[in-house]
Amino acid sequence: MPGPTPDSSRDVRPTLEAVAALAGVSRATASRVVNGGAGVRKPLVEQVRKAVDELGYVPNHAARTLVTRRNGAVAVIIDEPEFRIFSDPFFSQQIRGISRELSVYDAQLVLLLVEGSGDFDRVARYLAGGHVDGALAFSLHMDDELPSIIRRFRVPTVYGGRPGRPGAASEPALPYVDCDNRGGAAEAVRHLVSLGRRRIAHIAGPRDQTSALDRIDGYRDVLPEGDPALLAEGDFTVEGGARAMTQLLERHPDLDAVFAANDLMASGALRVLRERGRRVPKEVALVGFDDMVSIAEITEPPLTTVRQDVEGMGRLMVRMLMRRLNGEGEGDELESVITPTRLVHRASA
Amino acid sequence: MPGPTPDSSRDVRPTLEAVAALAGVSRATASRVVNGGAGVRKPLVEQVRKAVDELGYVPNHAARTLVTRRNGAVAVIIDEPEFRIFSDPFFSQQIRGISRELSVYDAQLVLLLVEGSGDFDRVARYLAGGHVDGALAFSLHMDDELPSIIRRFRVPTVYGGRPGRPGAASEPALPYVDCDNRGGAAEAVRHLVSLGRRRIAHIAGPRDQTSALDRIDGYRDVLPEGDPALLAEGDFTVEGGARAMTQLLERHPDLDAVFAANDLMASGALRVLRERGRRVPKEVALVGFDDMVSIAEITEPPLTTVRQDVEGMGRLMVRMLMRRLNGEGEGDELESVITPTRLVHRASA
């Protein structure tokens, strides 16, 4: 990325010396005022502030960070391409919780967008630059470099979702917030069993994410002897859910229930079932995961699904990070939190 | 926002001296390597890099910026609450264009989210901290403080949409990218006139945004003698469009066409027309603005609308900013760009 020419005279920023000169005070006094220091008489404070405003003086960033180590900013990093972040309501709900809770702490939310994992070099440079006090990272994949980048630059971080690689035995666990993926999935499948369904399929998420693996485990907890052909893998998108549903109907035309690992895939599955003339829930009962109200309440029929408190989890991540930044326990000692899930009954199952 | 206790020994970052000592080189040599400088023999470069990795050394941010004044990062600031940014496809399209083009320049997109205009103090502090090389700002409102904040901290900036307050006569104009709001609106209304429609209503956007005002002007250009009761104000949301349509039908039950200032409001208007049993386009013809494909192609009937190249405008904003950062003309001299619009014919008019 190009920068301005170094000798560009029009781009020279005013110095603290210029502020002091304009205010008619010593450099030390000007410095104390700029750094919010006490011990300066009020009229002098006002003179200096006026000079700062007049000159458009910008305090030296690093000098301030050395004193307080506070940028008043927290990075949010999501390992998904920008278009998924804006099309999957899961991310907007989580960001909503984070944004609202950061406001409470008067901290600026800095969302670092990437086009793909290849862009993490750039994210690493930004984190290395010391522009943020901490980070919240989510949607990690198994082969994700982010935890090692974060560890290398010693950025206090809380993860959303259990990270896939806990690291070598010598490395401490990473602090995270996650919902009870396994327990919630098991509850969904038990509900389908209780309705008398016998051929219960599962549309799983991508196997490089722990949330998908844990939900498969919950499905298997209830159906340990289930036919492996009743399990198809989607990618947490509407289209992925539709593709998986098509495969499942080809392999098992007699299936009578589907548990999809998120609501987006459930809505894709629902479309395929409707196109094939399968009545939901009469012929095929369907349960999703997430309880994204913007999806689950508008599908026809509305979706029975496993609710997780996505916004609340975002808020919790912020509070954990703030405790860490407050010096209350290192990240290494910060306890991870698993939040409960709850089956929400609607018409689809 | 709380920071770690200053004397927290576990939080001490490794110094350049420690890197030099571990690598067995002088501090000057270590500094040259860290700053990417030439003139250091390759084996020494490798020794220093190894020490940097081992210690997790983070280069002093300000020292680097003083040399190059490049953070490799650009802020994107949108004066809308976070929930609107994630629910209005206009913003995701613009961010998509910006994200892709910034990738070309290997610059990190830093999206600064706010809950409301009250949060601009915090954004100002972040900009003042010198964490970004420049900014892209959009969705400004008339009373927006953002331009004055940006001017004060001398952050090179390109605006998306013509800013509402060009500033005092002594202040130079702000560089912006916008579409031909007025010309596009006039084309939409001329199309409705050409279909023989005589009572053409307009659902306008909020009057504190120039895009809304310019589209009203385009409507008036074609219908200078139109009944003022045929104009209702929405807020660029689906619900706002529905409310405005309800008002218009109460005031003018005989209206035979509607031009809505964006597609979201057009889809809300369409819902109300359907609920009232008005056939579109037979009884009421409807034209939107934006051509958000995710809306205009899925409404029933599909929406005739004024297309603006939102993603392309985002890309253009990045290229203009990069020219500025390259020293090719100051912001004051950078020419603003108005991009053309085009009427896209679908079934609704």
Label each region the model flagged.
Chain A
Residues E80-Q93, L111-D119, Y176-E187, I203-T246, ...:
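Hinge/beta->alpha junction and helix N-cap segments in small-molecule ligand-binding domains
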